[in-house]
Amino acid sequence: MNILISFHSDYGHTEKMAFAISAGCQASFPDSRIKTLAVEQTELADFEHADIIFLGTPVHMGSMAWGMKKLLDSTSKLWMEDLLEGKVGGVFACSGGLGGAGGGVEQTLISLHSLLLEHGMTAVGFPKSLLGYADAGIQWGVAARTSNHEGMPEAISEQALTACRSYGAHVCYIADKLG
């Protein structure tokens, strides 16, 4: 399997999530070829060559980071030729800010799912039966909380990284079943 994990990261949290997802994929499917790339390094050809595509972003004002949005808007060229149709995708995000509601993380994950579906991909959620769901899971994907009670950035929890590894393995398992 060829796997692309593309992420935007501000404080390093989303990057850590991306590499934890990669570890989950690698542990479950050791022969996989995995590219874990920041959005600035991700090219359209990386999308084309991948069987599985993960997209990750921090939440910015209730939506994805502009760097991720810019990259995803550029995939319209791939959409015109149906080049991502039939691929499998997963999504992950982290959020901070004040309040316990997650700062728009659910809306952000839904918008990432929307892009996957627009391309004719199979979007894989995060079942509650998976390890880590109680700490950083939501039906759409991984949703990690990365701020303290004052809304300031903190380190990402080990429980959230466990959820990422679990989700990475799960998405690969689904892709293998569909393949």
List PLM regions with ranges:
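N-terminal beta1-alpha1 ligand-phosphate binding loop
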Residues: N2-F29
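Short hydrophobic segments within beta-strands
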Residues: S6-H8, L37, F92
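Conserved alpha-helical elements of sugar-nucleotide-dependent glycosyltransferases
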Residues: H13-M17, T108, A163
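Short helix-capping segments at alpha-helix termini
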Residues: G24-D31, W79-L83
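A short beta-strand-loop structural module common to alpha/beta enzyme folds
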Residues: D31-Q41
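Helix-loop-strand module that forms the ligand-binding subsite of alpha/beta enzymes
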Residues: E40-L131
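Glycine-rich phosphate/pyrophosphate-binding loop and the adjoining helix
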Residues: E43, G125-G179
